[in-house]
A protein has these predicted regions:
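Conserved beta-ketoacyl condensing-enzyme motif
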Residues: 57-80, 84
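Phosphate/pyrophosphate-binding loops at sites that engage ATP/ADP/AMP, CoA/4′-phosphopantetheine
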Residues: 47-61, 249-254
């Protein structure tokens, strides 16, 4: 049976395909069409996911569509999909139901509490669920405008960043702030998770929803720019309050599953991991709206068709990959000089040598990642042993603020030597802590409070990248590499070889490995 899921159709469109219970493909549309936050049906992703799954449109038995979706009337959307998938049933999936299914059925748990929190997916901004076997039942709901996601976005805008796009910057800034504004935000967010409209109202048009009373308590004149010195403390007050509030919403249970855009906040995830209330915490790593495409197919397979579970998500490498002939054709078409490395050992040896020479490498291997994070298949790599590596990554390639630190990839069997991490570090969906004896080595990557974006790489998850890390460790004594997504500022993650070539020659990357092909400047 082939099920096709469509989610994020208001602006983070994505497609996923489940075939006979196995997740075969998942792709965000913007990684293929390079349009910022594409809405509507993700036609390119649909075609590519079906190709990767080895399925035709006539073989699709169900199209699972996650609400809400653009301004197209539901009847018209059904008509469009019936034209494209003539033999398929059209199933509608509620937004938070899709988030919940994506979290629970991707997890390894047979029973769990599930918490989904976002901006306002379907007028609900949050739901707590109880999940067991193949069923997920809602226990409690929160409705807009009492939205923690909306509040986080409003503070993001207040601090001079883009709501809906740069909340992660507020998260990172918060790591260096004090808690002087935490009491104020605890008044904004009541103990029942309702937002006090005398401080903040999502329906208020002026000042991003904040009231004169809020600015008076903040000690800043309404309508003026927030002083730079106050920004970290405001960010910290918000982050601390959100963490405490979410802890109160999450309820009890042995296992906790998380999804929804708020849980792209890795510091929040780490707080829940470390609080000690649950034995295990799992966050669906593509927690935002694109990830509802996963939830759509899981919902139909498990909750509608009542099919047994198969052990959760096994991989996020669900996008397209490219063979040697496809890569070579692009390189020759671009009239580039390149070297073909005949063995994997030779390729790894060359990469380790260059990293030891403090060069910055682009690394494009295998199938593209689904979700917002690079996990070693579409990555830019540098050695922590180069004291200027993070500075060079920023100056010559990423052009981003110094407070945005780079991830550190480490083999799973050696991770405990360098970092304290939880299981969600497998997908870069949490943060870790640097061991005291290694603070100096990773000083440039520490966010504050010894936090670091640790990426734990198991051999079974990514054998080639794992080998690279191990070989780098043997050569230098440090099996850790800084890892950031292979894309330029403002662009999505590279998908195809031509994307990689464009990014390579538009940046200060020193060398690029695309499959077994090596390009140097």
């Amino acid at each position: 049976m082939v099920i096709l899921g469509l989610g994020g159709l208001l602006g983070d469109a994505a497609c996923a395909v489940l075939k006979d219970g196995e997740l075969k493909a998942a792709i965000e549309e913007n990684k293929l069409d390079h349009v910022w936050r594409p809405g509507g049906l993700p036609q390119a992703s649909i075609a590519e996911c079906l190709r990767l799954a080895g399925a035709t449109r006539d073989e699709v038995e169900c199209v699972a569509l996650v609400r809400p979706f653009a301004r197209t009337p539901e009847s018209q959307m059904h008509s469009i999909l019936r034209d494209q998938f003539p033999k398929a049933e059209i199933a509608m999936v509620e937004h938070h139901q899709a988030h919940a299914a994506s979290a629970f059925f991707a997890s390894p748990f047979e029973e769990a509490t599930v918490l989904t929190l976002d901006h306002d997916g379907d007028f609900r901004c949050g739901t707590r669920w109880h999940a067991k076997d193949t069923q997920i039942q809602a226990e409690r709901e929160w409705y807009y405008p009492d939205s923690l996601g909306r509040l986080y976005g409003a503070v993001t805008q207040l601090l001079g960043y883009r709501a809906g796009a740069e909340e992660h910057k507020v998260q990172w800034i918060s790591a260096s702030g004090d808690e002087r504004y935490a009491p104020l935000f605890r008044e904004v967010v009541t103990t029942s998770a309702r937002l006090d409209p005398s401080f903040f109202d999502g329906h208020r048009q002026s000042e991003g929803g904040f009231s004169p009373k809020f600015f008076e308590r903040l000690g800043i004149e309404e309508g003026t720019r927030i002083p730079a010195a106050a920004v970290p403390a405001i960010a910290r007050g918000l982050q601390k309050t959100v963490e405490e509030t979410v802890l109160g919403l999450a309820g009890e249970g042995e296992n906790l599953c998380l999804a929804g855009g708020l849980f792209l906040n890795v510091m929040l995830v780490e707080f829940l991991e470390r609080c000690g209330r649950w034995k295990k915490v799992f966050v669906q790593p593509a927690a935002g709206n694109a990830g509802t495409a996963l939830g759509a197919v899981y919902h139909v397979w498990h909750q509608v068709r009542r099919q047994k579970r198969r052990g959760g998500m096994q991989s996020l490498f669900l996008g397209p990959g490219y063979g040697a002939e496809e890569i070579k054709q692009v390189l020759e078409n671009c009239k580039l000089r390149f070297q073909y490395l005949r063995s994997t050992d030779d390729m790894l040896a060359q990469a380790v040598r260059m990293l030891g020479e403090h060069k910055i490498l682009a690394w494009m291997q295998g199938r593209m990642e689904f979700g917002p994070r690079a996990l070693g298949n579409r990555s830019i790599l540098a050695s922590p042993l180069d004291p200027y590596s993070t500075e060079n990554l920023n100056v010559f390639i990423k052009h981003r603020e110094p407070f945005r630190k780079f991830a550190a990839s480490v083999p799973a069997e050696e991770a405990a030597e360098y970092f304290e991490t939880g299981p969600n570090a497998r997908y870069l969906a949490t943060v870790g802590r640097v061991r005291p004896q290694h603070r100096k080595t990773f000083e440039a990557a520490i966010l504050g409070q010894d936090m670091i974006r640790a990426h734990v790489v198991a051999e079974k998850d990514n054998p080639l990248y794992h080998r690279l890390l191990r070989k780098a460790g043997k050569a230098t004594g440090l099996p850790v590499l800084y890892n950031t997504s292979f894309n330029l500022f403002g662009d999505p993650l590279v998908s195809a070889p031509r994307d990689a070539v464009r990014s390579f020659y538009s940046s200060g990357i020193d060398a690029m490995f695309v499959g077994n092909f090596l390009l140097e400047k």
